[in-house]
Amino acid sequence: MPLSLPVISTEVRQALDAGRPVVALESTIITHGLPRPRNLAVARDAERQLRDAGVVPATIGVVAGTPTVGLTGEQIEELAADEAAVKISTRDLPVAVARGASGGTTVAATAFLARKAGIRVFATGGLGGVHHGAATTFDESADLVTLASTPLVLVSAGAKSILDLAATLERLETLNIPVVGYRTRRFPGFYVADSGHDLEHSVDTPQEVAALVEARDALELRSALLVANPIPPERQLDPELHRRVLAEAWEEAERQGISGHDSTPFLLDHIRRATGDRSLEVNIDVYQNNVALGASIARAMAG
């Protein structure tokens, strides 16, 4: 076992040491979020997108028990093909390390490892949050509590729309995690540009985000800054279709007695099948849109 974890690739370490822009990318989208072989193509495209923008990509995952910041192309291929790869949140990291497991890191684990490596910007698709019925089940993503103590910039299209978004926004406020809309005053709903919930703050440029980060750091606040970046309306899932399919998914989950951790993959799979894979294409568009904004923010912060 390496004496110091995570292992940071030479390319990422040199970029950080030189003050060049770096953007972290998670790997559960590779291991669990997208079907094969599309998962590998999207992972490669995201890294290429960052490089074309003059930014060093740092895809983060765990390979054979080694948390790694800046996976090689071969390591990404291995994770993309590994049907035994596990989903690794922050609490799972010591277990994965001790047992030599391989897996994709969630938003929580990726944020933790990125910050430990010194990376300041992280782009993902959608944030985890508070699940429906959490008042009795206490089912809430570790993403939220991790971001409360991890001072980086997270770019996402809001939180996944299967969640209780009103409760998620309340928890973000309670945890002192600032949320700013990017060119919007409405919280995005992942598949749709507008979840129906207002945001108090918005920014119009990457430079404004950089200024917010500078102010946060000067105040020595330890929370992440969540930049809520909506998918362009012309590329979103039709809002009425989204509403109907989501309601049907919940009804089917209740009929089959599916709840807790099993509900997320069930609901997402139902939405994908019910929309004829249209939701899959929107998912990828959301991710690419956030990667592009993450690159712009990283450049602004490095400049």
Swiss-Prot record:
Substrate binds at residues 87, 107, 141-143. GO terms for molecular function: hydrolase activity, acting on glycosyl bonds; metal ion binding; pseudouridylate synthase activity. It catalyses: D-ribose 5-phosphate + uracil = psi-UMP + H2O. Its EC number is 4.2.1.70. Mn(2+) binds at residue 139. InterPro entries: Indigdn_synthA-like, PsuG. One of its GO terms (cellular component) is cytoplasm. Binds 1 Mn(2+) ion per subunit. It holds the Pfam family Indigoidine_A. The active site is at residues 26, 160. Keywords: Glycosidase, Hydrolase, Lyase, Manganese, Metal-binding. One of its GO terms (biological process) is nucleobase catabolic process. Its cofactor is Mn(2+). It is an enzyme of class 4 (lyase). PANTHER family: CARBOHYDRATE KINASE PFKB DOMAIN-CONTAINING PROTEIN, ZGC:136858. Belongs to the pseudouridine-5'-phosphate glycosidase family. Homotrimer. Catalyzes the reversible cleavage of pseudouridine 5'-phosphate (PsiMP) to ribose 5-phosphate and uracil. Functions biologically in the cleavage direction, as part of a pseudouridine degradation pathway. This is Pseudouridine-5'-phosphate glycosidase.
